[in-house]
Every structure is written in structure tokens, then in C-alpha cells.
Amino acid sequence: MFEISSDNPASGRLLYFRSEFSLDTEPKPLGGVASLLINDVQLEINEDGRLLYVWGYCPEQSWRTAVLKPPEATGAQLRWNGRSIPRGASLRLNESGPWDILFDPIGQNLRIGSTIVGDQFVAFAPGATAELSHGSLVCLWLKLSARV
């Protein structure tokens, strides 16, 4: 479960590195100690559970091309208030199986999500918007600054 705070998210850029099949945020905000996993994409959190940035393995061979319309989102911080995660560990949020990944090459948008439709949209980190349904993450929208 997540809670929304009115503080502004960190600034930066979300990049895709083709040679590594990975996402990364530059510059990385400091303080990450653990992560939440969606597929193999990690949402880095600090000791207080605040989501800091997105990074991780996301091979473009697994993406399906689609026309996407990213949601209007409020810029805010998200805090994980679910079960405790040990320092250096990850907790998988989509335990029932991998979520589909859709990519819009025109807008450079990725959608990693379940089939559940959310009721809140929070831009919580550089290039990252969480789609929430009753406080649970149902979709991750990513806006790539560049694919290098």
C-alpha cells in the first residue's frame, strides 16, 4: 500500500540503455536502501519508504508496440507503508506474474501494468507515474528522456 504526500518529487531524467536492456535515472537521488519490484524494474526506496527513482532490467524485446495516452498526474511523493523490506533487499509487487509492457515509440512512453484501472495518478520520480487503485500500484507509466 502507498500513501501520497504533497512534497515535490526529485528532478532528473529517466533513460533506457539499449546495450544493457535497462532503465536508469540520472542523477540518482541519494538514500536508496531497498526496492519494490514490478517485473524486473525496481522502484528504489529510502529508509522512510519514500520512492526515489526507477531503475532495472527491462529488455525492449519484451515490449509490445501500442499507441499510449499517459494519464494526467499530480506531482507528489509516494511512500511505501506496506511490510518492512530489509536493507539491500527487494519486494516483488506483482507476485501473480509479470505485467504486460507496452511501448509507444512516438511519445517514448512505457506502460508496465495489470488490467486493473486506477483511480489516482502520481508523478513520483523522474519520468515515472504510478497508477494506484485504492492505494495499491496497478500500473507504472514511464516517460523515457532518451534511449541510448
Residue ranges, per PLM feature:
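Intrinsic disorder/low-complexity detector
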Residues: 1-28, 41-43, 51-107, 148
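Short, structured motif recognition centered on aromatic/hydrophobic residues
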Residues: 42-45, 49-54, 128-130, 137-141
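Short solvent-exposed loop/turn micro-motifs enriched in small/polar/acidic residues
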Residues: 35-38, 94-96, 121-124
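Short, basic/aromatic recognition patches
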Residues: 26-31, 101, 111-119
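A structural detector for beta-sheet-dominated domains
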Residues: 46, 57, 113-115, 133, ...
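Mixed-charge, glycine-accented linear interaction segment located at domain edges/termini
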Residues: 118-148
